[in-house]
C-alpha cells in the first residue's frame, strides 16, 4: 500500500489501522451475541415466569461492556425481537457456517474453479432440498465445525 505520493505506508500504521478496524468488529460481534441471547432467552422462558427487565440486566452484565440503564426498556426498541422472535441468532450462525464453507476455498485456493463449481452444485443448487448439515458435510467432506468461526473471532 502506498500514500498519494506513491511512498509505502509504514507497516506500523497499517497494523494500527487493522487493529482499529478489528476492534470495531469485535465490539459489533459482542453486541450481536448480546442481541442473540436476548432473543433466545426471552422466547425460551414461560410468559408467566418471565421478568424482562431482570433478564435483560443479567444478559447485559454477561454479554455487554455497557451497564444496564434503569428505565430504558431496551427490548421495546429492539424491533427484530418481534419480527425474528427467537431466531435473531441466525446472523451469527450464518456467519459461522459461511466461514466454515469458506475454509475449503482457503485450503484449496480462492480461485479454484473446481471448488467453485462443487460449491455451486453441492450448496447453491440443493439449498432447501434437504437438511443443511447434509449438504454442508457433502461439500466440506466432514461435518460442520465452528473452528473457522472461532479462528475468525480470535483474529479480531
Question: PLM ranges: what are they?
Answer:
Residues 1-156:
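Cation-handling catalytic/transport regions enriched in His/Asp/Glu
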Amino acid at each position: 500500500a502506498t500514500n498519494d505520493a506513491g511512498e509505502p505506508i509504514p507497516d506500523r500504521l497499517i497494523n494500527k489501522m487493522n487493529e482499529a478496524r478489528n476492534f470495531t468488529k469485535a465490539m459489533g460481534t459482542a453486541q450481536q451475541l448480546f442481541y442473540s441471547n436476548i432473543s433466545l432467552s426471552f422466547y425460551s422462558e414461560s410468559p408467566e415466569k418471565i421478568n424482562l427487565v431482570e433478564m435483560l440486566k443479567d444478559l447485559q452484565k454477561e454479554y455487554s461492556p455497557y451497564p444496564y440503564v434503569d428505565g430504558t426498556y431496551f427490548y421495546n426498541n429492539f424491533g427484530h425481537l418481534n419480527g425474528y422472535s427467537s431466531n435473531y441468532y441466525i446472523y451469527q450462525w450464518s456467519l459461522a457456517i459461511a466461514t466454515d464453507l469458506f475454509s475449503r476455498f482457503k485450503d484449496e485456493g480462492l480461485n479454484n474453479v473446481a471448488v467453485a463449481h462443487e460449491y455451486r452444485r453441492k450448496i447453491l443448487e440443493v439449498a432447501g432440498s434437504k437438511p443443511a448439515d447434509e449438504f454442508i458435510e457433502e461439500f466440506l467432506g466432514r461435518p460442520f465445525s465452528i473452528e473457522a468461526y472461532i479462528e475468525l473471532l480470535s483474529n479480531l
